[in-house]
Amino acid sequence: IGFTADLGDKVIPNIVGVDIGCGMLTTQIPTDVGTIDFKNLDEVIRNNVPAGRNVCDEIINFEELEELHCFHQLKNIEWIRRSLGTLGGGNHFIEVDTDSKGTNYLVIHTGSRNLGKQVAEIYQKIAIEDMQGTDKLETEIQKLVKKYKHSGRRKEIQNGIDELKRKWKPDKLGIPKELCYLTGEHRKQYLHDMKICQEFARINRRCIQSAIFYTMNWTLQRNTWFDTIHNYIDHDTNIVRKGAISAKYGEKVLIPMNMRDGCIIAVGKGNEDWNCSAPHGAGRIMSRSKAKENISLEEFKESMDGIYTTSVQKSTIDESPMAYKPPQEIIDNIKDTVEIVDIIKPIYNFKASE
């Protein structure tokens, strides 16, 4: 799964999507931890990492939020601030995996939460308005205001604006609203705000990492973690990656397959034919609704045998391994873009459930 392209001097917010900067933070768990008490870990996560629609009780400061060009259009700012350190739902997860040498890893998959969603929707609306010629209407309004002020007709300004809006007819789009794009200053503003959302998502994962390591009394050692992100535009190359990750030469990446079969740790080959990219995950073979119709809870439970999880429930059937493409299909199709180092297997999994 995944899409990559150089969109040139245009950008379509909908292609990047609503979960800007979503990704996986992979952290090596210290070897001196020994056998992990998964019951305790599960309680720690449930008590310290809000999931689903839940947010934190306390606000974690994120000063860059007010640097967003669209800041004043955001709704429920406090809710956004309280979203740092939260997992969310859907395919987001927290997992402990073990590699072929017995080393354990904590993997956290989450993104920019409601902030990314709002920013994406704000800029897609701007893209639609721009392509409908709303900027021309704004220019006419500015001319009218200047003219009326100059001629001492201030009291007539509002009526004049209302009349312009009444007569204005939007340009025909010629393309679906979902594919409307930004250019010029609005493109620059979106890229700026998208980068802030990416940072929000990165810090969100780090907050979860810190909460788990601190509460479990694990030592967080330097240079033992790496981030693999998707749903963004690479500022250096202008490549958009939707459901795709960077796989530049020598770059360490993580590609999750499903909650039973684990994740691929690989190193990028820098293949230009692939836009130096790789899929961010396995991709679904069943929609969420189809999975809930066709997969039984019993089948789901059997598929997760041997993995500690309290998240296998009716509400999470749509995330069962059978809803995703077979691991071998992924392994066979990524060899041109990454070198597989290891496949880490899950021994603990947590997903939000109702």
Model-identified regions with their sequence ranges:
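Domain-length cofactor-binding catalytic modules of enzymes
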Residues: I1-P13, I20-M24, I36-R53, C70-R82, ...
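Acidic, glycine-rich loop-and-strand cores that form catalytic or ligand-binding grooves
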Residues: I60-N61
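N-terminal glycine-rich flavin-associated loop
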Residues: T26-I29
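Long, basic N-terminal domains or extensions that often function
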Residues: T31, H69
